[in-house]
Amino acid sequence: MASIPATVAAVPQTNMVAPFTGLKANAAFPVTKKVNGFSTLPSNGGRVQCMKVWPPVGKKKYETLSYLPELTEAQLAKEVDYLLRNKWVPCLEFELEHGFVYRENASSPGYYDGRYWTMWKLPMFGCTDSAQVMKELQECKKEYPQAWIRIIGFDNVRQVQCVSFIASKPTGF
């Protein structure tokens, strides 16, 4: 028998993938370079035009909000409403000699400065109205007219003092 050479036809493969040639810059994600200047930062400059703080020279620092002018009765009542809304217990404290920050019982720097203020009555557990706190403030001012008086707010769940601000200062301070 004679052999007949078989002819095999090459079948073209249509599912071949082109070889990986690397990433092409900016092919899929067009990116424009953004200049990060100060003009793109958020600002409240349009709303606050002439904000002036308490002068830093010759003025003693007291507590929270001490850089602002003295609060009015209405502003104090709003601050007390804030601490009542947060379920904090209001309390009044007063100091007759040193209302400003100084070191007496501790020499290390930090939040606590080592001073102790005298508590006016007991903390006002169950207080729900800022008028009650303002009435106690007036009584304390009447009893000690030359005292620094501050209102503090305690969180009795976490057992920490959350807010403290000066409510009254002696004349001349």
From Swiss-Prot:
Predominant location category: plastid
Transit peptide: 1-49
Subcellular location: Plastid, Chloroplast
GO CC field: chloroplast
Gene3D superfamilies (UniProt xref): Ribulose bisphosphate carboxylase, small subunit (3.30.190.10)
UniProt keyword terms in alphabetical order: Calvin cycle, Carbon dioxide fixation, Chloroplast, Photorespiration, Photosynthesis, Plastid, Transit peptide
UniProt xrefs under InterPro entries: RuBisCO_ssu, RuBisCO_ssu_dom, RuBisCO_ssu_N, RuBisCO_ssu_sf
GO biological process: photorespiration; reductive pentose-phosphate cycle
GO MF annotations, alphabetized: ribulose-bisphosphate carboxylase activity
Role, per record: RuBisCO catalyzes two reactions: the carboxylation of D-ribulose 1,5-bisphosphate, the primary event in carbon dioxide fixation, as well as the oxidative fragmentation of the pentose substrate. Both reactions occur simultaneously and in competition at the same active site. Although the small subunit is not catalytic it is essential for maximal activity.
PANTHER family: RIBULOSE BISPHOSPHATE CARBOXYLASE SMALL CHAIN 1, CHLOROPLASTIC, RIBULOSE BISPHOSPHATE CARBOXYLASE SMALL SUBUNIT 1A, CHLOROPLASTIC-RELATED
Membership in a protein family: Belongs to the RuBisCO small chain family.
Any further remark recorded for this protein: The basic functional RuBisCO is composed of a large chain homodimer in a 'head-to-tail' conformation. In form I RuBisCO this homodimer is arranged in a barrel-like tetramer with the small subunits forming a tetrameric 'cap' on each end of the 'barrel'.
Subunit structure: Heterohexadecamer of 8 large and 8 small subunits.
Record's protein name: Ribulose bisphosphate carboxylase small subunit, chloroplastic
Gene expressing this chain: RBCS
